[in-house]
Amino acid sequence: TVLTHGIMAIDINEWRAKENELEDSHKKAYNIATKNNASISYDCIGVGASAGGAFKRLNSQSGINIKFKGFDAGGSVNNPNSYYEPQRKNKDHFENLKSQSWQSVADRCKETYNAVIHNKEYDEDNIISISSDCKYIDQLIIELSSPKKDISKRGLIKVESKDDMKKRGIPSPNIADAFIMSYTHNKSSSFFG
């Protein structure tokens, strides 16, 4: 899980849950969001598919209205008709939301590097900051640099699949995925798990 506030990642956490412990994970994420007055973005495919229903139930039980939104990695890109680069729209460049989101974070990291190292002017909405108090920073860096950029059958940018990563002996980048989600829907203080 990654807790962000604006451009700043303020907490990175990881826990492992077996399939029969998913409800406990939903509660843990919900409690972190409640404590931080934050919203939740969650992976809504595969194991995470049940999270939306769980958060709705927890809202009903608690009387609190925590906002939550599913992240469909294989879904359509955001702003499909906007231009990623001159002459190339998002829908003509990225295979899916996952590839668009990973590229967005890579672009923000490059912008941050240029601002810090080369003292270039920057738009605050286009950079990333990670609190030095965050646990798992080293793991995050490893995971962000693990998947390869790939080209889909349609000739669009995509992120290497987890199955292909597994063939290379690389585990699923769970912390990086949470980090990527946190910067996809991030407009204010937000918790993304």
Regions of interest found by a model, annotated:
Residues 2-156, 190-191:
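Mg2+-dependent endonuclease catalytic cores in nucleic-acid-processing enzymes, primarily RNase H-like
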Residues 162-188:
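Acidic, Mg2+-coordinating catalytic module of metal-dependent nucleases/exonucleases
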